[in-house]
Amino acid sequence: MSGHRSTRKRCGDSHPESPVGFGHMSTTGCVLNKLFQLPTPPLSRHQLKRLEEHRYQSAGRSLLEPLMQGYWEWLVGRVPSWIAPNLITIIGLSINICTTILLVFYCPTATEQAPLWAYIACACGLFIYQSLDAIDGKQARRTNSSSPLGELFDHGCDSLSTVFVVLGTCIAVQLGTNPDWMFFCCFAGTFMFYCAHWQTYVSGTLRFGIIDVTEVQIFIIIMHLLAVIGGPPFWQSMIPVLNIQMKLLPALCTVAGTIFSCTNYFRVIFTGGVGKNGSTIAGTSVLSPFLHIGSVITLAVMIYKKSAVQLFEKHPCLYILTFGFVSAKITNKLVVAHMTKSEMHLHDTAFIGPALLFLDQYFNSFIDEYIVLWIALIFSFFDLIRYCVSVCNQIASHLHIHVFRIKASTAHSNHH
């Protein structure tokens, strides 16, 4: 899933005082703020300066986008002008995550059948996220609250949503019965999203394909509804001629989509560098971002195949979420590198979680792998949130704006 249409929409807002931007913090708020803040600012003074100079550039449009524009325009017209674009995005993301967690709760191995209402909730949650994610930029332009932080915030939410969307899809079709296929589909989704921003880091322009995130999301919503209508018998039925189970059809579509998308991405990566001698926008090697995503996938494959207790097969959802949080963080760092025209460094605390799993296996599972997986999951999630909060706060402070609140002067002028 390429997952990047939404950024055409806006560039939101932020806050110098706190992650949420609701004014003065209580003592509890101060403690939480320190807990979720990095000890040192993640961005340098030069990066912040270059961030100010960043201008969003995009090219192309997807198949369904023109058809959906009427609905999106109608929807944004129903939103009060005092609601901040980033608040719209985070509400949609929260709904998307909560509905997917319902499926994870009922189907921890992606082989079980959840209550029918859970699939309906997941389909609705994804549609709500897709809708809100599409109008946040329109709201930003409508309220004159566009800023570089909004673009970063939007990409960050998309990077996390991608993890939950692909996981929810695998659960809906009960792909846990085919662990290799489930592994491929989940990591292909996060890899394609990363590549979309990799080629942006190289060329300076975010490109949209004819089949993009809107089309993929509609397809996934349909699959959730098919899980309601047909249930397990539908996904277990055989496809004539091909002689494969119906559940493998989405997986084969993922293979085709990955080949098609990556062909376009790597054509830009190898030939579209706008820096000196065809380098990235930051003047670095066009291949340097591969080290990060390559390390994540390599560790994921090694731990999956070397596990003596079938860690992935027994706990696929926890496994995907753990590595998904790691992928989301390095994707966010890639977006930051693009927007600040700076180099990506390989050393990162994001790799600590996977490293714990790797070392535990190296020492013959000195600690139960399941316990280490939970530790890695919690650490990776905390590490991701801490980085995102710190970056948002620092940029907000620098730009003198709010994360989830529109400045009173801006809101007042637009109200009239």
From Swiss-Prot:
- Membrane topology designation: Multi-pass membrane protein
List residues, modification Phosphoserine: 18
The EC number(s) attached to this protein equal 2.7.8.1, 2.7.8.2, 2.7.8.22
Which InterPro entries does UniProt cross-reference here? Answer: CDP-OH_P_trans (IPR000462), CDP-OH_PTrfase_TM_dom (IPR043130), CDP_ALCOHOL_P_TRANSF_CS (IPR048254), CHOPT (IPR014472)
- Provide a GO CC annotation, any one: endoplasmic reticulum membrane
Q: Which GO terms describe its biological process?
A: phosphatidylcholine biosynthetic process; phosphatidylethanolamine biosynthetic process
Q: Where are the transmembrane segments?
A: 89-108, 116-133, 156-176, 180-199, 210-230, 246-267, 286-306, 315-334, 349-363, 368-388
Q: Which residues carry this modification: Phosphothreonine?
A: 40
What is its subcellular localisation? Endoplasmic reticulum membrane; Nucleus membrane
In this chain, CDP-choline is annotated as bound at 86, 151
Sorted alphabetically, which keywords does the UniProt record give? Endoplasmic reticulum, Glycoprotein, Lipid biosynthesis, Lipid metabolism, Magnesium, Manganese, Membrane, Metal-binding, Nucleus, Phospholipid biosynthesis, Phospholipid metabolism, Phosphoprotein, Transferase, Transmembrane, Transmembrane helix
Organism superkingdom:
Eukaryota
PROSITE patterns from the UniProt entry: CDP_ALCOHOL_P_TRANSF (PS00379)
Binding of Mg(2+) 2 occurs at 133, 154, 158
Signal peptide region: none
Per the record's keyword annotation, is Methyltransferase included, yes or no? Answer: no
**What enzyme class is recorded for this protein?**
transferase
Q: Where is this region: Disordered?
A: 1-20
Any one Gene Ontology molecular-function term assigned to this protein's record:
1-alkenyl-2-acylglycerol choline phosphotransferase activity
Glycosylated residues (UniProt): 144
Q: What functional role does this protein have?
A: Catalyzes both phosphatidylcholine and phosphatidylethanolamine biosynthesis from CDP-choline and CDP-ethanolamine, respectively. Involved in protein-dependent process of phospholipid transport to distribute phosphatidyl choline to the lumenal surface. Has a higher cholinephosphotransferase activity than ethanolaminephosphotransferase activity.
Q: Which protein is depicted?
A: Choline/ethanolaminephosphotransferase 1
Q: Which organism is it from?
A: Mus musculus
